[in-house]
Amino acid sequence: MTSHEEAPTESENTAAGTPEAPPAGPLGWALLFARVAAWLVVPIYFVGMVVLIILERRIGSSGEGLVEGLVLFVGFGVFAVVGGLLVAKRPGNPVGWILSGASLLVPVAAGETYAAYVMTTRGEPDWLAVVGVWANSWYWFMCVALAFIFLPLLFPDGRLPSRRWLPVAVISGVGVLIVVVLGMLSDTLRGQNVDYTVENPIGIEGLAHVEELPFFAVLSGPLLVGCLGAVAAVVVRFRRSRG
């Protein structure tokens, strides 16, 4: 190349089959993080579910019924696969992250099952058992919100149908946050399928489990608003697609 020749542009490199250099700076790191996360979603999900199944057999608990468990395993497995692909291909679309996040919350149940195993075999929890049963007190609310509220609201392009849907997203989001925080701070943590209790190291004394609070019905209001809004958003998008 002589001094008078210009360097090929990015579009010319692409047309010639020369790969473009990855973006530099924060954007490049963000894309790298998205690719790594996309590759990890499916393995983490399936390893977590296998651990859950093994632990359930160890303590003699079947958890959900066979059909319900299979539907849960396959359904959120699809979430993990599709979510990972979307995160890899369209990292700017929140739908992929929602699918991935919801799928990775399901194996959190393995932590509570481990706690049940420890309590039935040793009678005293170790730190991992405490973390597991603590996460069990709030993770399902977040998982349900991601899968049944925010996914329908933002599907498929990662945007709300219009700005008028913003209050629905905000109200349901605040409601979920309050429920999750109250679940994190409950005084006593308890088993799901095995009867045991563990003291919450960060719990507020006297604060009951979130579902037993006298005002839980009030807290359920924002979640109901979110679910109804999610269904309405799907209907609106379907009608728009049909003209």
PLM region spans:
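Alpha-helical transmembrane segments of multi-pass integral membrane proteins
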Residues: 2-243
